[in-house]
Structures are given as C-alpha cells and as structure tokens.
C-alpha cells in the first residue's frame, strides 16, 4: 500500500535532517497514529540505524542493540558479544562508519519508553553523552514513543535530564480527513465521511480503520 499523508510531518523531520548541526528529535503520539511508518519513510534514502525497543529487560535490550550496531559496522564485534552498558553502546554511535553518500547517519529509537522502563538511568546517560559527545557527531537521533504523558513529563519536562536538549519536537496527531480519504478513492464523499467519523468515534485515530 502506498504511503499517504504526513507530508508536513515528513517535511519537518527532513528539515531537521538537513540541519548542519547534530539533531536530537523527539517524535511522539498515541499508538497507531503512524509514527513508525512515517519514520520508515524518512529513513528510505538514508543510512539508518533503526532500533525498535520491546518490553524486555535491560540486558535483552542491550543485546539486541549491540547486534544492530555490529551489523552496521561498529568496532568491537570481534571481541564483544554485547555492550556492557548503555553509556558504552551510545558512545559507540560516534564510531560507526561514515555514510557512503557523505551525508549523516540517522539513528531511530522506536518505543524509547520501553528502554527507560528497563533502565531508568538512560535519560541521564543520554543527556551526559549529548552534552559532551553526541551533539558534535554527524548524527540525527530520533527518540520516538507512544507514552505521551511520559515523554512530555519525563523526557521533555523541566525536571528531566534531557530538558532543553531537543533540537526538534514532533507531536503527531490523528490523520486529518482529507489525507485519510485518499485511502478510499472509490468511496463516495458521503461514505468517506462516514468511515472517518466511525473511526473517530471508536478510537479517535482515523488510521486504525485505514
């Protein structure tokens, strides 16, 4: 199925990617609003490290991320089975091979709140590394999640270690009618409106029916 809509969201993310300085961008919104697919579209023409976190332990998350890093060419795969800590793992982002096209690397952490759940110190670790290392790297890091109140309070709020570090914030809202209607080119105008209204009534998220 063709990717429909989200033009403004993609434009905002692409503009962040083309900025000269390193980027730390937060993308959030309710579940099934289209965050992951939008990020997949963003990543299509870029060298990307896409890590989809799961509801797992810290050790399991680190093992999965380590495998992804080693596959991307990070040093250490010959003598490490996995990174011992998130501090070490995130530091190694700066040692990944430079993109072959001469551009910057895109690093996406999808469902980041799962990582914080398994290791509550992670926001502090990321803040320290961003301040001293990562903000000077040729990277765009995207922190994505569905736990909206958690992201707004624990990651973006004034009491968060990451407060003031975001270079971009995208709160994704439900797909507007004119975009959603494109999924049903053969529907009458009335049927398109009914399908959209039915979905809003059920979940407040049009993309669920689409």
Where are these predicted regions, by residue range?
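Phosphate-binding site recognition
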Residues: 1-210
């Amino acid at each position: 199925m063709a990717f429909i809509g989200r033009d403004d969201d993609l434009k905002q993310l692409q503009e962040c990617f083309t900025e000269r300085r390193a980027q730390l961008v937060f993308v959030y919104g309710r579940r099934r609003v289209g965050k992951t697919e939008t990020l997949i579209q963003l990543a299509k023409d870029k060298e990307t490290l896409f890590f989809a976190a799961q509801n797992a332990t810290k050790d399991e998350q680190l093992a999965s991320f380590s495998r992804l890093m080693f596959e991307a060419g990070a040093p250490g795969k010959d003598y490490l089975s996995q990174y011992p800590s998130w501090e070490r793992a995130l530091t190694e982002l700066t040692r990944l091979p430079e993109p072959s096209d001469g551009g910057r690397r895109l690093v996406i952490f999808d469902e980041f709140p799962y990582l914080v759940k398994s290791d509550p110190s992670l926001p502090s670790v990321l803040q320290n590394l961003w301040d001293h290392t990562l903000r000077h790297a040729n990277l765009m890091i995207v922190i994505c999640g569905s736990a909206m109140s958690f992201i707004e309070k624990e990651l973006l709020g004034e009491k968060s270690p990451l407060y003031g570090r975001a270079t971009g914030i995208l709160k994704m809202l439900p797909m507007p009618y004119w975009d959603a209607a494109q999924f049903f080119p053969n529907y009458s105008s009335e049927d398109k409106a009914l399908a959209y209204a039915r979905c809003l009534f059920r979940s407040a998220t049009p993309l669920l029916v689409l």
